[in-house]
């Protein structure tokens, strides 16, 4: 048998021999066993948890030791086998007693040998363990040397932070616990402890946490995640327990306040405020408003102090008094008024050398324009051009409110007209100086004195007659006497000593506003006090916003506007009304508060008007006169001033039977929503200088909504007036058509009394209305039931012919009675 052949168990046994026959190795547990013939394990060698290099060297030593033991066992086995063979051959020569004695000797010998073998194996294992211990010491020394080399290259401030990651790297490199391998004492002494071999530990979350933590203390103790979680929860409980002491505030409460605003003023949660309201039996959300009394109860219940203020106090921030030392001379603001086509726009063209009349339909100015003219001596005049048509009286009235001087233009060839008188009344009401410009003096056959005499009737008296009005004959077309007009304006402005402060927050008036596609809300304003700058927050009526851009009357963008300067601004959230006062405020919150206050006032006023109107309708119904018809309209215009002028003119149309109702009005093109509203309310859509979009036109065609376009306001008013006239009930009146004299009365069976009559005048018709007169007193009024000529029924009988007649439900007819015949005729009424 060779050394490489597999050793198989022998059937022949010698007692309890511990002869080593085989070895085995378990790859899962890392255990190598040496087995004897009875499958009893003699030696078990376990794999250590040291690094790969040490493990290989130990395995080599173990294999060499095992091979030595196996070789010695083989030799002993062969020796004993030869002895057994010899004993078997000699057994024939000895008796059983001798064989028994030999067996006992062999057993004793085997026991002694077994003890020797066990001793040899224990010595080998002990030697192997000593070698492993030596290897561990070498590894520990190597770790210390590497650690010192690396630490010497690290700055002092980072050594402690880097130590943890360094030891972990060593542990990975050499396969042992780095924290237990080294213990640093002082700066130079290193003690290498005895290292206990154990299986590699499974990598846990705590190990990851330790590697990522920046513990500068270098503590080797590892905290579990559960411990960390408990510590954090404890910190949270401490924070919760440290609730700050509640602060009670002094709350200012206006007449109406929102729930959310009240909560913010008290620094309370909205939910707490809502709970307090629910205790009072009020269900409200954060966006709803409550009255001052309810708000005071809520604030008091929450421990706050309440100060009540009037809601109108929000506008107190708009009051600014100018200091006398800050006042500076400003340019005069001149308003040009007059009748239609008397030359107001042409006069402005001549003054500022621009042709704006070409852009006006029919030479009629449709909305206010503001212009600034700089004269040759660098003095400036601001002109406001108001329309001359009577429908724009509201706009002209606003123009008079903001002006310093009024120029009334009168055509020398036309004289005083209705709008001229109206302009005079507005100027007188404003209490401003008046200059009368008698225009078109270049035309032949004019009489200036006649114009002056007509103005005297309206208490417009010239200086030459002892009055204070300046008359200047001019020709805007030929530019005659324009310099005299400018001199008169400057003279009056110097006499008035016009001044304003350019400092402080700006204020002024809205001249006009509109919406332009791509630019948004455009508002023309006139600055009256302070200086308006880009970025200012302004409030105008119920509109507010930040000034994003300012453009002057020349179309150039500017950064600021001083008193008497008209500009067009962008940035308001909605279109303000012409004539609204604008003010600059400190912040957007102030502007929003003022706007909300004004909106509430407008709603209350609207509700009051609606309630009064509803009461009037109820009284009419109760009186039996409830046949009131309604004409609903939707008005869309290019500018806000036109909306007011159109609405004012339409509402002035006299009618007790037709109620004109403006469902919606706005600035901008006609939209699809306007068409939808008109469809559900059977309204007419009116567009003034605007058109409907494609979608709106498509919707109007489907729903059969009537859309009408206008460019001249009096055409619009005439059409609406005609529509309202068509809705009026016609007038029914009696039209006399003839007379009949009763000459004889006949009683006919089954028919009754028939009056034999003679037509004395006109014509008599069957079914016509009749009045029976006896001694010139009407004793019956009714209808003609029967009309016969001889025995035939006829429709009419003319004058000079005889006929037979009978009345409906009346037979008290006598000879000599007279019958008047009439028809009921309907006539269309006009407003």
Swiss-Prot record:
Residues 385-388 are annotated as: G3. GTP binds at residues 338-345, 385-389, 439-442. Residues 475-477 are annotated as: G5. Residues 338-345 are annotated as: G1. GO terms for cellular component: cytoplasm. Pfam families: EF-G_D2, GTP_EFTU, GTP_EFTU_D2, IF-2, IF2_N. InterPro entries: EF-G-like_DII (IPR053905), EFTu-like_2 (IPR004161), IF2_II (IPR044145), IF2_N (IPR006847), P-loop_NTPase (IPR027417), Small_GTP-bd (IPR005225), T_Tr_GTP-bd_dom (IPR000795), TF_IF2_bacterial-like (IPR000178). Residues 363-367 are annotated as: G2. It comes from the Bacteria. Residues 329-499 form the tr-type G domain. Its main location: cytoplasm. Residues 439-442 are annotated as: G4. One of its GO terms (molecular function) is translation initiation factor activity. Belongs to the TRAFAC class translation factor GTPase superfamily. Classic translation factor GTPase family. IF-2 subfamily. One of the essential components for the initiation of protein synthesis. Protects formylmethionyl-tRNA from spontaneous hydrolysis and promotes its binding to the 30S ribosomal subunits. Also involved in the hydrolysis of GTP during the formation of the 70S ribosomal complex. This is Translation initiation factor IF-2. It comes from Rickettsia typhi (strain ATCC VR-144 / Wilmington). The gene is infB.
